[in-house]
Amino acid sequence: MAEKNNANIGFEKQIWDAACVLWGHIPAAEYRKVIIGLIFLRYISSAFERKYNELVTEGEGFEEDRDEYLGENIFFVPEKARWSTVAAAAHTPEIGTVLDEAMREIEAENKSLKNVLPKNYASPDLDKRVLGDVVDLFTNMDMSDTEEGKDLLGRTYEYCIAQFAAYEGVKGGEFYTPSSIVKTIVAILKPFNNCRVYDPCCGSGGMFVQSVKFIQAHSGNRQSISVYGQESNADTWKMAKMNMAIRGIDADFGPYQADTFFNDLHANLRADFIMANPPFNLSNWGQDKLQDDVRWKYETPPAGNANYAWIQHMIHHLAPNGKIGLVLANGALSTQSSGEGEIRKNIINADLVEGIVALPTQLFYSVTIPVTLWFISKNKKQKGKTLFIDARKMGYMVDRKHRDFTDEDIQKLADTFEAFQNGTLEDVKGFCAVADLQTIEKQDYILTPGRYVGIEEQEEDSEPFDEKMARLTSELSDMFAKSHELEAEIRKKLGAIGYEI
């Protein structure tokens, strides 16, 4: 049986249910910060306490030695910030002050978190009785299953944003990239030791978490990766800093949040790998003030859509052998409006597009438009060729609204790319095809995978039409007869209790 990704949202739903206790007791603008701060504190305290108890059992007296924790990438938590201290104060009037002090202690312990953690728990707007109830709920949660490999903060926050959007009647933002998409990008790009990884719109930092995990899984050194990110939203930037702190990843997100187009915090960076999920079809991004920008090598992107601004920004930041994996709305594959078709043509003719993967719908919690993975390379192994994959039928339904990839799905996509790069891939009707530049030119430089992979071959139906219709008609007649029998039985039962129909 195919191994499924950690797609179920049971833990996130527990968090959301706990958060709902606070609904109506705190201003909406502060709501998310309060919950995320509690998640962060509960998470790092749980990891710390497990190690602390191990050291106590060993009896060597090292349980307060910071190096014992830092050596295993476990966050050292000062006594006043430990969850046991918070839990003990849950039903006292001072619970807000205790939480604020815990956050200050954590920031003092880790300078990179200065002014990052929320410290609004003592606010008079927050009902302390209700806050204590939420602390109790967090205390009683089983955190044993939240190992480092899960992008807990990002998944939980993204889930909560979708819920907020549903309640408020507005669209949830593209805050977080689902783990199956991140894993697919990383599995195809294969980041290596001593590499520089960059995300110009990093959200909660999930791309970096998965890159580190990939390197570890392939016997690499997690400390050898250099992480660079930028985020324009202040709360999201803080979220990313917290996410990296939890996992012991040393990241450069700049000294503050900033707009990537107007204030490039890593202007001189040339990255080995760039992974990103930029905001889809962003309009009014400030093109009029960036007309002659050095990044627009393949023509200036239009004011009404930033898709090709993101692509060119990333190409600009690539090292000579660098690679990009990014998520874009499907419109970028075929649009001809406002000069976008010309930009796409120029990028294709520069032989930068290595592969395009059409993804299934419903992979995101809160975004329903179809999306595509783009893979761009400065030094392609297969010169003058591009791989097209139609993965729209892959994956499985987690529930009625959400789809995910299995690990086997992700491996199949990665293996297909590797075979293409090695020159051993054979086209598979309806799934994958390799096209040269001349073929793409004949398609007017449109990159929609369906134009190249064709339609999946169907097994020939050997049953003659007349025989099939006779069989199906007979089966339908039997079903109708059974339906009439059931209807008569139901009428009889209802009549027996005085309800004639």
Over which residues does each language-model region extend?
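Short, contiguous acidic/charged loop-to-helix segments that flank catalytic cores in large enzymes
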Residues: H25, W285-N305, G331-E340, P360-Y365, ...
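Hydrophobic alpha-helix feature that most strongly marks membrane-spanning transmembrane helices
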Residues: Q216, A245, I249, P279, ...
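Conserved Class I SAM-dependent methyltransferase catalytic core
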Residues: Q14, V21, Y31, I35-Y43, ...
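C-terminal, active-site-flanking charged/polar segments
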Residues: L352-V353, L363-S366, P370-D415
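Conserved S-adenosyl-L-methionine
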Residues: K171-A276, N281-K297, L328-G331, G339-V353, ...
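Hydrophobic alpha-helical scaffolding
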Residues: P124, T146, C201, G229-N233, ...
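Non-catalytic, mostly N-terminal accessory regions of nucleic-acid modification and defense proteins
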Residues: M1-N193, D252-T260, L265, A358-T361, ...
